[in-house]
Amino acid sequence: MLAKRIIPCLDVKDGKTVKGVNFINFRDAGDPVALAAEYSRKGADEIVFLDITASHEKRKTLTDLARRVAAEVNIPFTIGGGVRELEDVSALLAAGADKVSLNSSALKNPNFITEIAKNFGSQVCVCAIDAKENNGKWTCYLNGGRIDTGKDLFVWAKEAENLGAGEILFTSMNHDGVKTGFANEALAKLGQIVNIPVIASGGAGSKEHFKDVFLLGHADAALAASVFHFGEIDISELKTYLRGNRIVVR
């Protein structure tokens, strides 16, 4: 059994880490580089940085941040937000990022996934999907949850895999920031449909939620933000708890 991964997510807006509830109402959660270094020390397996303003405001990517983070942390990290061209990917990887996360750009131009996979390898490409459940149907959203595409979550995840994505990062907008647990039913279904790792995002509020996302949601990795940023859950303690529940972690 592959070890389950714990991944802090740092949403970056105007150079600072922020965390909202259901994609709005941001609180300042500190310097992203300092936070990343702290998480690396505490045993995080990877870190994800998402520039949550980039796609909406059409700004370029986080190359400078990638360079600063690479100098401070020794675990893999992913950067997303405004990645639209191969040059963006190349610049981020050259600056020290291990992977790039695509969301809006992949839905608008699905072949971009294939271009990245061909040029840099599937392992570099994380397809991030923001989805919301309405009347039992999960649909994908664009631009930080502002635009409903009407596209089915499960159909798009399988398409992304076939196009060359190496991982799926699924955020449940219904669960994001509200700390009532992950979307385990949808995650379990997703895990049956795709054959690439699924990262669960949205809903972490307790150590038990992490246990459930692995045992019930069958996620390969769990991503969270505010519970880590504001000290509600310590990563090293979380891993000890998971080991005690017979979940393999690094």
UniProtKB/Swiss-Prot annotation:
One Pfam family in the UniProt entry: His_biosynth
Protein name stated in the entry: Imidazole glycerol phosphate synthase subunit HisF
Record-level GO BP terms: L-histidine biosynthetic process
EC number: 4.3.2.10
Self-association state and partner proteins as the record states: Heterodimer of HisH and HisF.
Catalytic reaction equation(s): 5-[(5-phospho-1-deoxy-D-ribulos-1-ylimino)methylamino]-1-(5-phospho-beta-D-ribosyl)imidazole-4-carboxamide + L-glutamine = D-erythro-1-(imidazol-4-yl)glycerol 3-phosphate + 5-amino-1-(5-phospho-beta-D-ribosyl)imidazole-4-carboxamide + L-glutamate + H(+)
TM spans (from-to): none
Function summary: IGPS catalyzes the conversion of PRFAR and glutamine to IGP, AICAR and glutamate. The HisF subunit catalyzes the cyclization activity that produces IGP and AICAR from PRFAR using the ammonia provided by the HisH subunit.
Pathway listed: Amino-acid biosynthesis; L-histidine biosynthesis; L-histidine from 5-phospho-alpha-D-ribose 1-diphosphate: step 5/9
Keywords tagged on the record: Amino-acid biosynthesis, Cytoplasm, Histidine biosynthesis, Lyase
Catalytic residues (UniProt): D11, D130
Name of encoding gene: hisF
InterPro entries membership: Aldolase_TIM, His_biosynth, HisF, IGPS_HisA/HisF, RibuloseP-bd_barrel
GO molecular function annotations of the record: imidazoleglycerol-phosphate synthase activity; lyase activity
Top class in the EC scheme: lyase
Main location: cytoplasm
